[in-house]
Amino acid sequence: AAVVVTASHNPPEYNGFKVYWENGAQIIPPHDSGIAAEIDLATTKPLPLMSLDDAKQQGLLVWLEDDYYQSYRQTMNENALLTPDSNTDISIAYTAMHGVGADMAETLLADAGFKKVASVTEQREPDGTFPTVNFPNPEEAGAMDMVMALGKSVDADIACANDPDADRFAVAVKRPDGEYQMLTGDQVGSLFGDYLLEQQPNSLVGNTIVSSRLLSSIAKAHGAQYYQTLTGFKWLTNIAMEKETEQHPFLFAYEEALGYTVGNKVWDKDGLSAIVAFSQLTGKLKAQGQTLWDKLEALYRQHGFYFNAQRSIALDPKSPPIGDKLRATPPKNIAGKKVAITEDLKTSVKTYDDGSEEAIDLPSSDVLIYHLEDQSRVIVRPSGTEPKLKCYYEVISDFPDNMSYEQAQQAAEAKMNELIDAHQKSL
């Protein structure tokens, strides 16, 4: 077992304490509550202390030296999904966002044959005060500004970022007009899914319940197995180990919050292998005379234009719990569309509009999922700690041949805005 302490993009008072089990994945029940109970017990006992020097001499403290990093590097270079090829003629802008990713990201990209890699100098070295960004989370507006500006100055094909502890990966792609546009986690996850399944079709891929269903459709088209879990990478990796077989080995999993794992070398989200794989995808497309936008459009034309959004809604603190209200009077329609299926993960029951029911094979969680008759989906997650509701929306629009990408995007956005407005008014 192992522990990783990291604040990453969170404020320093919220240092993360991540516990990994012997299988290399983060812990799930019953280990989480078992360890928490032991921690509580430890607070009631005297705490034996030892100096760092003594601990080191007794072999109780082992500093991770360069050989540790080289073993990770070697493992990544031996990952069959990251095998270098000749399609490396792309330009990459990169930022470590004042975190720890730069050395390894640059090393792995060089190992894979990418020679045109420019790093944002001001953000390259670790600095816990994060002086150049308001909030060092690549999902936040403005966090990618410097790497996109660098991308523009070197005419990069992609402008990439790791978050400060380098487990997440974000990318902005050059548009035909020369500007850079961020891809969403779902867009990156779908591109990855298709690209990796082309290499290894009969595989197992998965994502979380709040991520896009496009991956499920892509998996089906490749004859692959698809699975879905609760949010959190601990579920994606532990369930993957349970579900994979010789016929369907685990290939890839992602969550919409920019977390990806490529292959079975790291049983957690890993922003470093992700940047290598995404650069290889970009290089392969460029060698074929295509861009990432072309590929995304082709996926949308094949499967439908999937569009996702999420909102946080503040609720009246004096009103009764929203989950109780929604369960007492389940909505029959949302935005004028009939609710065809309701999934209640708290009771693990899926209810169809004809009243029939079936069990849901997921751990219990305070989440409600509504599938509408037009294939739209609304997911409602009440906060356990404050009067707040997190809502995740997905719409699927037609994308016929006579429609441009811009028109399809506008149609999906209009459909999404209508759904969000109507749903929020109904709460």
Locations of the language-model features?
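Short beta-strand micro-motifs enriched in acidic
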Residues: 6, 381-383
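Gly/Ser/Thr-rich loops at beta-strand to alpha-helix junctions
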Residues: 10-11, 96-102, 166-168, 211-213, ...
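Short acidic, glycine/serine/threonine-rich loops at helix termini
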Residues: 13-19, 47, 103-108, 129-133, ...
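Gly/Ser/Thr-enriched, mixed-charge loops and adjacent short helices
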Residues: 15-150
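Phosphate-binding and adjacent anionic-ligand microenvironments
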Residues: 152, 156-158, 179-181, 201-381, ...
